[in-house]
Structures are given as C-alpha cells and as structure tokens.
From Swiss-Prot:
Highest taxon listed in the record's lineage: Eukaryota
UniProt-listed InterPro entries: Stathmin_CS, Stathmin_fam, Stathmin_sf
Origin organism lineage: Eukaryota, Metazoa, Chordata, Craniata, Vertebrata
Region described as Disordered: spans on this chain: 165-185
GO biological process: microtubule depolymerization; neuron projection development; regulation of microtubule polymerization or depolymerization
Gene3D superfamilies listed in its UniProt record: 6.10.280.30
Protein name from the UniProt record: Stathmin-4
A GO MF term: tubulin binding
Amino acid sequence: MTLAAYKEKVKELPLVSIFCSCFLSDPLKKQTYKYEADTVDLTWCAISDMEVIELNKRASGHSFEVILKPPSFDGIPEITATLPQKRDPSLEEIQKKLEAAEERRKYREAELRKHQAEKREHEREVILKAIEENNNFSKMAKEKLAQRMEVNKENREAHLAAMLERLQEKDKHAEEVRKNKEATR
C-alpha cells in the first residue's frame, strides 16, 4: 500500500469509525463497552496504525490528538500493476473492422438518401396539393362569376323587356287618347 493510498483510506473513514468502531485482533478477548455519560473509554478501541492521546479534560468535553502511524510494508509482497500487453491485430481483424466500418457508412448513406427522398416526396405532395387547391379555387371562382353574369344578363333582359312593354303600353294609351281626341272633335 502506498502512502497516497493510505491517506485516501484514512480520509474515507468517518470520525466515529476511527474512534469507536475498531476491531481487536482476537474477537474472543474483545472488551464490552460500557457507556457512561460524558465519558469516552479509549481502551475499548484497539487501533494498530494510529494513536489517540487525551490532551486535557474540561467540563465542556474532551480534546484529543490523533497521531497516524506510517504504514508498515513488512511482509507485504510488492504488487506491480501490469496491464496485459496488447497484441497486434491481425490482417483479418483489421479487414473485418474496415468492412464493418464500410457497412456502417453505407447504411448511414442509405438512411440519409431514404430520408432525403421522403422529404422530397413530401414537398412534392405539398406542392401538388397546393396546385390542386389553387385550381379548384380558380374553377369555383370562374363558375360563380359565370353564374352571376348569367343572372345579371337575365335580370337585364327582363328589365329591358319590362321597360319595352311599358313603353308600348304608353304608346298604345297615347294612340287611344289621340283617337278619342280626334273622334270628339
């Protein structure tokens, strides 16, 4: 264990664990802790790599000094972390990877072409629909205009016929009045 790893290990331990959750080497001889108000029994913990010294006792509490002992590397075999050596890839593996990459590239291109074709088809459908709606609108407008012109023509002809008929009646009436006037003379 390196010194840096040891420091990290100590940082990870909670303070309560450092003071009170220590294990004796022999669990059969483990002392039982008796809780008394406002006291801490330092003999209950057996910590092999740290030393706790009581500095002074006050009415407000205790103060301690915790001295961490350096780790001893006696009897611990040296562990060297070696990564397994990477072997050189064979020509077949390289070829397989290249083929797989080519397949992925072709698949992506096909998907892109498919997406673009769908987009163009949608745009074409939208344009055709707009043209069809425009043609329908033009056709309906022409039909309405033709119908209104026909109605106007019929109304005009009927109005002219009515005016002509009234004029003829006036002429008849005037002719009768002239005849009556001449007959009375």
